[in-house]
């Protein structure tokens, strides 16, 4: 029960397992004659390994004597992957079910543009996770894309901070308005997900204060 992607190592065997719904990702790669397991395909690129495939939902794989073996002891179940992997958690260059997370996010931005009737001067992403969707929106709507917010990459995720005051401070430390790009402009602000609204409220005020 529950969502998991496990990797275990004994003296002679490397084991990987994924929950029956495939909630969390796990991939198989090959580096020379050796097999590699990782939570995202981008990790394989970093070490020069070749991506082979995803571990299927409910599958257990094990590598022994440089041979890959597969078991499916839990029967067949319909995959139910976590949507946050597609829109937020996974790195944009990681593959999920045949496409990169970047492609999924860009296509979501295009779909938003098709459904939306708002007119504005600029499309601005909430970086970095909103970048791909904003690019898709910009392409579909033919509205200029600008980095109206600059991110401090040394600050973590604000929505998981324990207190409201800390979350609010985290937003200010994490993002700053790029005044030269947005002053006097009307903006379509694109973000990937909203949890409490803490971040979006602060960001909108920040952009207004910068002259948008």
Regions found by a protein language model. Name each.
Residues 170-212:
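PRPP/pyrophosphate-binding module of the type I phosphoribosyltransferase fold
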């Amino acid at each position: 029960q529950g969502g998991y992607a496990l990797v275990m190592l004994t003296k002679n065997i490397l084991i990987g397992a994924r929950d029956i719904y495939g909630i969390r990702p796990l991939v198989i790669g090959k580096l020379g004659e050796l097999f590699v397991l990782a939570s995202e395909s981008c990790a394989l690129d970093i070490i020069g390994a070749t991506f082979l495939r995803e571990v299927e939902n409910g599958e257990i794989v094990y590598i022994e004597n440089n041979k890959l073996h597969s078991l499916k002891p839990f029967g067949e179940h319909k995959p139910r992957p976590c949507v946050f992997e597609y829109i937020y958690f996974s790195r944009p260059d990681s593959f999920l079910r045949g496409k990169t997370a970047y492609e999924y996010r860009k296509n979501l931005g295009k779909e938003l543009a098709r459904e939306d009737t708002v007119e504005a001067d600029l499309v601005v992403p909430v970086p970095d996770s909103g970048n791909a969707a904003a690019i898709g929106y910009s392409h579909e709507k033919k509205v200029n894309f600008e980095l109206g917010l600059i991110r401090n990459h040394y600050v973590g995720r604000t929505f998981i901070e324990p207190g409201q005051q800390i979350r609010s401070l985290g937003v200010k430390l994490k993002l700053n308005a790029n005044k030269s790009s947005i002053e006097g402009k009307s903006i379509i602000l694109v973000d990937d997900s909203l949890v409490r609204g803490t971040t979006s409220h602060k960001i909108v005020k920040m952009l207004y204060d910068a002259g948008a």
